[in-house]
């Protein structure tokens, strides 16, 4: 058993060690040769084990000479040269005994230099792209290199840096404005670029001060807009600082009086501007940023302010980002948001207010998605195919949020601009292709009448009759197709405090106002209805019969319930008071058409104050 354990590894005999020593002119005893043979076996096993680790790390099954040389260098041993050839070395036996050695052929350098045949290269010709940027000193910096920490600045640049930082972080707004304008146009501050980027990266240390965060974002905006600066390796740091202001739950957001929403809007717009103007430098960040926004949006532990930042960030990156990230996760996210909005407890008031912010941001994003999808479906619609037409992806659409105007009058992309991914940018895979009607029907089930964009969701228009031989398809269920809600107007003219809708008071009021009651037209049930220019609508006030006391005043109140398939809905009521100013009575002589259908006939009497209640 002991002999088997001793023979688990291949051992070099002491005779081989003695022969190697004699070839160099040394004589060894048996004890020394045995000790050297044992040590040589251990060193070879160690080098072989390390070289096999290098082979496994490169996912290969063949051990090469380079792996063995790496193992020798790892053990601080000089590498063995001359064995890296792909061809096997010829071995020759010695005459004296069973000893083999590699054959070393003599090579004539003169014949090799004067040879006419040129050896072919071992590898195929390949082209490798290497991008270099100019650093602050005018030298070429290789791609991905980190600038050195120690750099020498002139006294003028150092004074400029100190004055600008004091002006930006100081208390004088006019001086800060001048400093930011100079940062945006100065062409001699390339050496100070890493220092200003380091200042902008300090947003993580001042998350409790919104004013300082706004100023640092303005510094980043000025650096990005400077046409004389090449951001190069610093653009990743700037994008990270901007994303911190967009997504992170800042310490200043704890106080509800702090307007951190504007900070997130401005940071999202700045992120869109970076991708629009420096797409070649951030080509590898588009996918990572979309994944970061998606991760924050789908995390229920994150606060609602972070969800708001994720939504406005997707909106700033364009409607395609909204379609690929926000729209697929909307059904899952809507359940949690609806639970927050339906909680009417006093302790949930602030969280509910934040939920309404997120609700509004999602509404603005999906409305832009609907508009851009509609324009993509109808490219030849009027106004889009004429003179000066540009694709939908290139149009700098306006937004309801913060907008910026670039220097020099150049157009700049705002929120929801349909910004396409920059050249060379690979975005996430497109979701399942859905038609505009399917997307609108799905969004209408969430938002109801809050959507400003309107498309038909009811039954399709009747088509031509089918031949008798065709099989009639079953009609869709009433619940499966959601129709647009219909406004119902109840035209009830309310009397004033001293008047009553009864007969006597009505006659007195009529006589006082010197106006005749409206004649009633009795028509037989089978008589045909008169067709005119206003066919299909009914007028509330068919004639101008106002009292001489002055022009009447109208108060419109629209109320209803925002309902959907996934929620009970919320009641809402909005009043639209008319301006009380001097206006001629002829302004109200025009006919007001009814909205929808009337539930009952209107009762009329002469008044100077009318009320129109429109429940949904």
UniProtKB/Swiss-Prot annotation:
Region Disordered: start-end pairs: 399-432, 455-539
Places the protein is found: Nucleus
Keywords: Methylation, Nucleus, Phosphoprotein, Transcription, Transcription regulation
Record's keyword annotation contains Aminoacyl-tRNA synthetase: no
Pfam families: TAF, TAF6_C
Record GO cellular component, one term: nucleus
Residue numbers bearing the Asymmetric dimethylarginine modification: 549, 555, 587
Family: Belongs to the TAF6 family.
Protein name: TAF6-like RNA polymerase II p300/CBP-associated factor-associated factor 65 kDa subunit 6L
């Amino acid at each position: 058993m002991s002999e088997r354990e001793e023979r688990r590894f291949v051992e070099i005999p002491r005779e081989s060690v003695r022969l190697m020593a004699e070839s160099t002119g040394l004589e060894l005893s048996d004890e020394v040769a045995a000790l050297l043979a044992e040590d040589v076996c251990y060193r070879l096993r160690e080098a072989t084990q390390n070289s096999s680790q290098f082979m496994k790390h490169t996912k290969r099954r063949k051990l090469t000479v380079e792996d063995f040389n790496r193992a020798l260098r790892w053990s601080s041993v000089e590498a063995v040269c001359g064995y890296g050839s792909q061809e096997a070395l010829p071995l020759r036996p010695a005459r004296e005994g069973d000893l083999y050695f590699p054959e070393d052929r003599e090579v004539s350098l003169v014949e090799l230099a004067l040879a006419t045949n040129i050896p072919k290269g071992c590898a195929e010709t390949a082209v490798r792209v290497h991008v270099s940027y100019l650093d602050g000193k005018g030298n070429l910096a290789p791609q991905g290199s980190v600038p050195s920490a120690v750099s020498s600045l002139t006294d003028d640049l150092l004074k400029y840096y100190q004055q600008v930082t004091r002006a930006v972080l100081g208390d004088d707004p006019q001086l800060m404005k001048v400093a930011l304008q100079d940062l945006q146009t100065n062409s001699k501050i390339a050496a100070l670029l890493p220092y200003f980027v380091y200042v902008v990266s300090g947003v993580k240390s001042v998350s409790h001060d919104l004013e300082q965060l706004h100023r640092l974002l303005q510094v980043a905006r000025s650096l990005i807009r400077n046409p004389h600066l090449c951001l190069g390796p610093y653009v990743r740091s700037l994008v990270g600082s901007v994303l911190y202001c967009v997504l992170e739950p800042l310490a200043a957001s704890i106080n509800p009086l702090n307007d951190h929403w504007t900070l997130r809007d401005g940071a999202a717009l700045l992120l869109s501007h970076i991708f629009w103007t420096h797409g070649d430098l951030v080509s590898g960040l588009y996918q990572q940023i979309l994944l970061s926004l998606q991760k924050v949006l789908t995390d229920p532990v994150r606060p609602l302010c972070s969800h708001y930042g994720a939504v406005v960030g997707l909106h700033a990156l364009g409607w395609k980002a909204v379609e690929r990230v926000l729209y697929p996760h909307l059904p899952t996210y809507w359940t949690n948001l609806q639970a927050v909005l339906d909680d009417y407890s006093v302790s949930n008031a602030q969280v509910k207010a934040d939920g309404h912010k997120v609700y509004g941001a999602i509404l603005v994003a999906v409305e832009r998605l609907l508009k851009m999808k509609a324009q993509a479906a109808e490219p030849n619609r009027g106004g889009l195919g004429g003179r000066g037409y540009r694709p939908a992806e290139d149009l700098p659409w306006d937004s309801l949020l913060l907008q910026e105007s670039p220097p020099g009058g150049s157009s700049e992309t705002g929120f929801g601009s349909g910004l396409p991914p920059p050249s060379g940018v690979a975005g996430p895979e497109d979701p399942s292709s859905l038609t505009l009607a399917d997307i609108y029907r799905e969004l209408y089930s969430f938002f109801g009448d809050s959507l400003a964009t309107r498309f038909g969701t009811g039954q399709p228009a009747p088509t031509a009759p089918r031949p008798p031989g065709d099989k009639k398809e079953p009609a869709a269920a009433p619940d499966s197709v959601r129709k647009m809600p219909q406004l119902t107007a109840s035209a009830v003219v309310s009397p004033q405090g001293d008047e009553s809708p009864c007969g006597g008071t009505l006659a007195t009021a009529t006589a006082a106002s010197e106006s005749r009651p409206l004649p009633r037209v009795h028509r037989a049930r089978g008589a045909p209805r008169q067709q005119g220019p206003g066919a299909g609508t009914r007028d509330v006030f068919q004639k101008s019969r106002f009292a001489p006391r002055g022009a009447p005043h109208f108060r419109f109140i629209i109320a209803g319930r925002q309902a959907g398939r996934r929620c009970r809905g919320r009641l809402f009521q909005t009043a639209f008071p008319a301006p009380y100013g001097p206006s001629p009575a002829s302004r109200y002589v025009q006919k007001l058409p009814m909205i929808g259908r009337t539930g009952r006939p209107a009762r009329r009497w002469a008044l100077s104050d009318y009320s129109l209640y429109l429940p949904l």
